[in-house]
């Protein structure tokens, strides 16, 4: 049980207008908007952001990540991040989801400060760069100093169930220090949320709630992968509003008990 009755937060990670609309229909509280979720998400284009804004009324935090892979950024990559923060601020995003590390696995405080300065009044989430940092408890404190309001994390494991011990520790640290909100992500399902509500004080959850859909193409030239040979080019991933609604129902019921 929780000491303070903090409102629950259900954030849905989406990479299409269709998914954004499904998330809203299911009762998500907020969107994390990205492109190419199939590689863990990279920065979305402005066109996608504007269409999502037009078709969907939910608050939007934009994931900013210039490429697949680690969070050690070259000068040019960092310049892209800085420009994207400015662009999405001008376009009216509610927040950005960012993270930069140094070679030794510490949080790159200078780069983070610069991006946060550029963000102005937008809210800041520290993304799963946190899950590959060297000293999570220290980075949690630093995130608080930077004014970051949310940390998206799996507890430094392949999924948040495996990472629950660290997530519990971080949640306790938050109750002592009033630092950033801990948002559990990676492998979140309605059942996982139920387990977390029984065993932790965590109130924020991040999921893609995705279903696989068959491509509408009747004509199919197989054996011509566009990138990742392990993935079918004729499978489409989309948020399922029913899964979002089930997650929301579990949170709502727990909130009224």
For the regions a protein language model found, what residue spans apply to each?
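Active-site mouth loops of central-metabolism enzymes
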Residues: 6-15, 64-82, 125-136
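Hydrophobic faces of well-ordered beta-strands that scaffold small-molecule active sites
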Residues: 8-12, 31-33, 60-64, 96-98, ...
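Catalytic cores of alpha/beta
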Residues: 18-22, 72-83, 134-146, 184, ...
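Glycine-enriched alpha-helix->loop->beta-strand junction motifs that scaffold or abut catalytic
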Residues: 26-31, 56-58, 92-95, 118-122, ...
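Alpha-helix-loop-beta-strand connector modules within alpha/beta enzyme cores
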Residues: 41-68, 108-128, 164-189, 231-254
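Active-site pocket-lining/capping segments in soluble small-molecule metabolic enzymes
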Residues: 103, 183, 202-243
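Histidine/lysine/aspartate-rich catalytic loop segments that bind and position anionic ligands
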Residues: 125-162
């Amino acid at each position: 049980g929780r000491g303070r009755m903090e409102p629950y937060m259900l954030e849905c990670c989406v990479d299409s207008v269709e998914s954004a609309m499904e998330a809203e229909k299911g009762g998500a509280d907020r969107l994390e908007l990205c492109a190419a979720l199939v590689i863990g998400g990279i920065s979305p284009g402005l066109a996608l952001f504007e269409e999502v804004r037009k078709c969907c009324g939910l608050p939007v935090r934009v994931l900013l990540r210039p490429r697949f892979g680690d969070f050690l950024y070259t000068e040019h990559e960092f310049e892209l991040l800085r420009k994207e923060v400015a662009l999405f601020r001008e376009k009216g995003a509610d927040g950005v989801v960012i993270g930069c590390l140094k070679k030794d696995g510490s949080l790159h405080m200078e780069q983070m400060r610069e991006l946060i300065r550029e963000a102005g009044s937008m809210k800041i989430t520290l993304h799963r760069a946190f899950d590959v940092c060297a000293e999570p408890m220290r980075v949690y404190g630093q995130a608080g100093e930077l004014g970051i309001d949310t940390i998206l994390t799996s507890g430094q494991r392949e999924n948040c169930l495996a990472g629950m011990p660290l997530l519990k520790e971080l949640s306790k640290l938050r109750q002592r220090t009033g630092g950033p909100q801990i948002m559990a992500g990676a492998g979140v399902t309605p059942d996982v949320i139920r387990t977390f509500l029984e065993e932790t004080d965590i109130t924020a959850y991040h999921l893609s709630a995705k279903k696989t859909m068959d491509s509408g193409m009747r004509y199919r030239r197989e054996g011509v992968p566009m990138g990742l040979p392990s993935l079918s080019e004729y499978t489409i991933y989309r948020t399922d509003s029913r899964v979002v609604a089930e997650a929301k129902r579990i949170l709502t019921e727990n909130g009224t008990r």
